[in-house]
Amino acid sequence: MTEPLQRRRVLFVEDEPALRFSYERFFRNRYELSFAATGAEAIEQLHAARPDVLILDMRLPDTDGVDLLRRVREERPELPVLVTTAYVSMEPRLRVLDLPFQGYLIKPFELRDLGDRIDALG
């Protein structure tokens, strides 16, 4: 007897309630979801939810996304991270800081595209 496929656990770190709502509505049947609105909540969820993928908004109310990404890399270096931001100029900054991430989406983007990127992570 084959075991059922386990849904991928995705942690969305996003401070905008409307976007969290959109993510939840669009992806709730596709992934096991958890959410954080601040960097502090993100670290809590990183431990509690043990996500397979992290979707990280770079602008948060309590921390800089780069600092949070650095902390994530210290705690979970293997965790795939997709960065989302409205700032077009963030990618070069992240590359210079040598903080690896697996993808970059500039807001606004299509949720379908985000799902395709998550699925492509393997």
Regions found by a protein language model. Give the residues of each.
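Conserved acidic carboxylate
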Residues: E14
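Two-component/phosphorelay signaling modules centered on CheY-like receiver
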Residues: P17-S34
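Acidic, metal-coordinating helix/loop segments flanking the phosphotransfer/catalytic sites
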Residues: F35-V53, E74
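Acidic catalytic/metal-coordinating carboxylates
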Residues: T38, D64-D67
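Alpha4 helix (beta4-alpha4-beta5 surface) of REC/receiver domains from two-component response regulators
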Residues: D67, V88-L105, D116
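C-terminal output helix
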Residues: F109-D119
